[in-house]
Amino acid sequence: MDRKTYLCGRDKNEAVSTPHEYTIEQILAAEIHALQNIPHENDYEGAIGLILERVHEGGGRLITSGMGKAGQIAHNIATTFSSTGTPAYFLHPSEAQHGDLGMVCSSDVMLLISNSGKTREVLELVALTRRMYPTLPFILITGNPDSPLSGEVNVCLSTGNPKEVCPLGLTPTTSTTVMTVLGDLLVVSEMQRIGFTYHDYSLRHHGGYLGDKSRELQTEQR
């Protein structure tokens, strides 16, 4: 079938030219390659320890933030942290400028996600937060460890800046895959640090398959 006829708003006779085309095997290989090349030298322990100190020892919360696709990853990371024993929420950088910054407390820690490391709204969020709480710490996940944002944070976790597996080289694809995995790394490591159990899990999952499964596993463990 001629793919030209399937794009909304385009004349079906309009010529199509994409800079590059990937096979399914190449797409999968590119995603795997990106994961295999996540920098091992990142200060993972620093990030994990900072969350432990601020949230579990200091009574604060983990705040995640980002714009666009990175923001969606940040939102997912926040909900996963919350469901596994680390109180967290997502703060939209733009909404923060219209009152939502009031949700931030001095004991919190903020996890920012920006592939470029120079997202305007995220840079503004850092500046505005520091006006309220000058010592509040920041963690950054980015593809650009030499960026303006990198110079503003306490811990910087590099994605390795993988090439996007997109015909145009623009759409966040491999970069968001790595961001998600780095979020998983932080979540799982924090669960292990705090000794999160089946019982703890069941208290936070009252319904659905996972709730039933956690209670079943808790019973088996007794």
Residue ranges of each PLM-predicted region?
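Histidine (H) residue identity feature
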Residues: 20, 33, 56, 75, ...
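Residue-level signal for secondary-structure boundary elements
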Residues: 35-36, 59, 198, 213
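General structural signal for secondary-structure boundaries
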Residues: 39-42, 92, 194-198
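An N-terminal, well-structured beta->alpha segment
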Residues: 4-5, 9-57
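Glycine-rich phosphate-binding loops that contact phosphosugars or nucleotide phosphates
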Residues: 52-53, 61-194
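Internal, active-site/partner-interface "lid" segment
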Residues: 151, 165, 192-222
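N-terminal charge/polar-biased segments
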Residues: 2-13, 214-222
